Structures are given as structure tokens and as C-alpha cells.
């Protein structure tokens, strides 16, 4: 019997992963975000920060703070540079997620442990989890969400999407698939259903 089910939420860009995680959290699950963890490492004078500066150049730091927009402009569209950055960040992100899981499991306060990991399959991390939930949405819907939220161009959307593995590959390996082409309320109902199903799996 598992003490605390490890669940990863993944999916393509702007599919609704973060919104699904928000609902899980409201229902009582513990939620951690790989993106937020990686952003927490971006401190100029830290060991990780210095490695990022060595890779991308000092211009990514403005007023003693990493400028994520400058970093994005450098790495999206340059796959080699992007993968080199990920090689610095991702092992540390996985370490933090696993440390946090051990801590949360000891506390015995939460019914589920949820980790939002956008590049779950790309970094070969799926096996660590007990279940994988894939959030999907049609490309035109995702593109519209992305451009509306970020004010970035369609080109920027496709550059970022290039880092993700194919939708078909993710569909093949996911345990649960949640389609998110509708409203936030529709997504909430679907997440609630799976929350109680997963909670009952313990």
C-alpha cells in the first residue's frame, strides 16, 4: 500500500496544466511546479546561477536579477543552447521534487502529491511517478491562450512547442488523459472526478 501517491501532470504548451494543478490544490492535494522550482534557482550569485551565466552570458542578468525574457529569447529557437540550459536545471529540479515528496509523505497531511512537469517525457522522468495525467487541448486553442497570456507571437509559440515530444507519444504513455478544450469550469469537473478516483486508489 502506497503512503502517498505520486502523480505528475504534464502536457503541451498552454494546454491547461497549471489550471488543473490549481484545482487539485484547492481540493487538498500537495502541488509542486517544476517551472517554479527552476525559476527559484535563477539567482545570479548561486552555484546554479553562475553556471547559467557562463552558458548564456552576463547580459541575461539585469539589475542583479535574471531576466527571463532575455533568457527565453536566447534559448527558444536554439535547441542546443536550450538543452544545455535544461541539463543544468533539470537534475536539480528533480532532486527538489523528490526531497519535497519525502518531506510531504512524512507529514501525512495530504491525500495526493502532484508535480507539474511540462517536459516529463522529454527528460525521462515519468517512471518516478505512480500515475501520469496528460492535459490536452487543440493546437489552435493552445496558441490562442498562449498569445493572449504572454503577448508573444505565433512564431514564439511554435518555437517553444518544438521542445515538446509529440502529442501521440505522450498519449501512448499517459495513465489518464484530460481534454481541456472547454471552459475552466468544465476542466474543474474533470479534475474533481480524477481527484476522488486517485484518492480512492490508496
Swiss-Prot record:
UniProt entry keywords in alphabetical sequence:
ATP-binding, Coenzyme A biosynthesis, Cytoplasm, Kinase, Nucleotide-binding, Transferase
What general EC class does the enzyme of this chain belong to? transferase
> Could you give a single Gene Ontology term from the biological process aspect?
coenzyme A biosynthetic process
Leader sequence residues:
none
Q: Where is the DPCK domain?
A: 6-202
Q: In which pathway does it act?
A: Cofactor biosynthesis; coenzyme A biosynthesis; CoA from (R)-pantothenate: step 5/5
Cellular component (GO) terms are: cytoplasm
Annotated ATP binding lies at 14-19
Pfam family for this entry, one: CoaE
Among its keywords, does the record have Phosphoprotein?
Answer: no
Any idea of its EC number?
Answer: 2.7.1.24
Q: Where in the cell is it found?
A: Cytoplasm
Record bears the keyword Nucleotide-binding: yes
The principal localisation class reads cytoplasm
Superkingdom, natural source = Bacteria
An MF annotation (GO) of this entry: ATP binding
Q: Which family does it belong to?
A: Belongs to the CoaE family.
Record-linked HAMAP family: Dephospho_CoA_kinase (MF_00376)
| Stated role | Catalyzes the phosphorylation of the 3'-hydroxyl group of dephosphocoenzyme A to form coenzyme A.
**What name goes with this protein?**
Dephospho-CoA kinase
The gene name reads coaE
Amino acid at each position: 500500500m502506497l503512503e502517498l501517491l505520486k502523480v505528475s501532470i504534464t502536457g503541451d504548451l498552454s494546454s491547461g496544466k497549471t489550471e488543473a494543478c490549481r484545482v487539485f490544490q484547492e481540493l487538498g492535494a500537495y502541488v509542486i511546479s517544476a517551472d517554479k522550482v527552476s525559476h527559484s534557482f535563477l539567482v545570479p550569485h548561486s552555484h546554479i546561477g553562475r553556471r547559467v551565466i557562463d552558458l548564456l552570458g552576463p547580459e541575461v542578468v539585469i539589475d542583479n536579477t535574471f531576466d527571463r525574457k532575455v533568457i527565453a529569447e536566447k534559448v527558444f529557437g536554439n535547441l542546443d543552447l536550450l538543452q544545455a540550459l535544461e541539463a543544468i536545471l533539470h537534475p536539480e529540479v528533480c532532486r527538489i521534487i523528490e526531497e519535497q515528496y519525502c518531506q510531504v509523505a512524512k507529514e501525512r497531511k495530504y491525500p495526493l502529491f502532484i508535480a507539474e512537469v511540462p517536459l516529463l517525457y522529454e527528460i525521462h522522468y515519468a517512471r518516478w511517478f505512480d500515475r501520469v495525467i496528460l492535459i490536452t487541448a487543440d493546437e489552435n486553442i493552445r496558441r490562442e491562450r498562449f498569445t493572449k497570456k504572454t503577448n508573444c507571437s505565433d512564431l514564439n509559440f511554435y518555437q517553444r512547442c518544438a521542445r515538446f515530444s509529440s502529442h501521440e507519444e505522450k498519449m501512448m504513455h499517459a495513465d489518464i488523459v484530460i481534454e481541456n478544450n472547454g471552459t475552466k469550469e468544465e476542466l474543474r469537473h474533470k479534475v474533481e472526478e480524477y481527484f476522488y478516483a486517485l484518492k480512492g486508489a490508496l
